[in-house]
Amino acid sequence: MDKKRSKKSTLTQQQRNNKRQRANAQQLDVLRHEYRLCATPDAATRRRISALIDMTERSVQIWFQNTRAKQKKAMRGRESREDDFDDGLADVSVDDVSVDDVSMTADVINSPVDVIHHRTDVSSSADMLHHFGADLVTTPIQTHFNHLLATPPTSSSSSHVTTVDSPASSITDFSTLGHMTPNLTPTTPHHVTLPPIFFPTLSLTIGNWRRLSPQLSLAYYPSTDTMLYHMTSEKTQFRMQFPFSAIEEIHVSRNPNDTLGALNLTLNCSPSFSIQTPKAPGRWVGCHDFSEGKQASNVTTHVCNGPATVLQQQLSRVFALRSNHVNGHVSRRRLADVIGSSDIIGSADVMGTVAVDTSNHMISSHVGDFELSVTSHCEPSHMIEPTPTPTPVANHHHHRSADSVAHVTNPSGHVTNHNHLSDPAANLTSTILGNVTPGHTTPVLDDGFELGHVTDINDLVSVAQLLPNHVTEAELASNCHMIANNAFTLDPSTPLSPFSGTLDYLEYY
């Protein structure tokens, strides 16, 4: 005993720092999300992750190494069992692969969660739904949970039965998934199936009904333009989905004293619901609202808690995909013309905006110090009357163009006004405006995200065209950490990163 104690005392501080640190459930959510983005992070990325989740860099490195090893082992096991599968199931799509399947460790299974075990035998779908709705108000049931779904959601109503018939994928090396850059050229789901974008959701609250991780996931499916919640209770799986066009408002709010934040959604219609029972694996059957008191059908506001920075980045990726899908064919000249049209920046209250014509709805997203507004080209009878814009100061002489889209945002009232577009060609335009707020830090996409992967639009626009009227170009250039040639890069596919190069942040004092 004395020898052991003596040996332990000879450890250096560096050796003690290198000891493995057990991750809690909250840290694991962030680690899994980062693993989906990149399975082999470099030293800078590991340092960023360790600072974000308060773990040592060595512990982060070990977690990634172990996860890659488990994934390769699972892949070898899958290959050895391929002969046992029917020919129709031999090809596996990207959506069939779960990082959580191969990375789930005792850290999650033994995480401190109050568990209520239910041993009730449920003989019918109706009984399961009743049992599920009542159970969700308490605490989640401790089960092994697969965050990624076997099939992407369908865009049609869930009143019918769906089976596992997702398109086959040619990807067999799952270790490369973290390095994949989605093909963002305009296409249809029949040509390519993009992987879903997952939001690290620790809890979901709708009215008084609450669901907790790890029996919960939220993802955006680009192929169907659908948001989908996936939940489990014992061996029964539940889905709640709605089209992205059903979202009236979506924004990320954060506590300045905490790393956690909330993704807030407001819907204009109730979601559709489906269930998959153990007796019919792979078959999703439409069902009634399984939430307690059917609150998911009656309450339109959803609150999803999770790491604020990651929620913010994932929301920007969703906007990027949708923006590029709609506006991929817009010419550089059209974008430059719209940027140059000048009442877009009209007063000190105007935040940087992203204006994208998509479907017939309006989405406004507060993300960090940015406000992203996605508005549709509505008929005149549905248009909001524009409010008068204050006259700009002498430093910025701008004149309204006939085809400009004016976005005036009142941060307190959260209202976005726009004028009717007289030029139909301007309907499919994207304007990316840099927002510079005194005394604030504007986060952008992580430093591993290269703009060249997602767009070939690299026109540089004068800083003077993008500034609020109370800031001069000289003030910005002298007070910012980094601006490429005093210019911003037009990049409609990355709403949160309209700057040249790969930046961690841009500060203005």
UniProtKB/Swiss-Prot annotation:
Region: Disordered, residue numbers: 1-26
Pfam family, one: Homeodomain
Subcellular location: Nucleus
GO molecular function: DNA-binding transcription factor activity, RNA polymerase II-specific; RNA polymerase II cis-regulatory region sequence-specific DNA binding
PANTHER family per UniProt: HEMATOPOIETICALLY-EXPRESSED HOMEOBOX PROTEIN HHEX (PTHR24324:SF5), HOMEOBOX PROTEIN HHEX (PTHR24324)
GO process annotations (BP): cell differentiation; regulation of transcription by RNA polymerase II
Protein name in UniProt: Homeobox protein HOY1
Binding region for DNA: 16-75
Organism encoding this protein: Yarrowia lipolytica (strain CLIB 122 / E 150) (Yeast)
Highest rank taxon of the organism: Eukaryota
Entries under PROSITE patterns matching the protein: HOMEOBOX_1, HOMEOBOX_2
Principal subcellular localisation of the protein: nucleus
Transmembrane residue ranges: none
One GO cellular component term noted in the UniProt record for this chain: nucleus
Annotated keywords: DNA-binding, Homeobox, Nucleus
CDD domains: homeodomain
Gene3D superfamilies, per the entry: Homeodomain-like
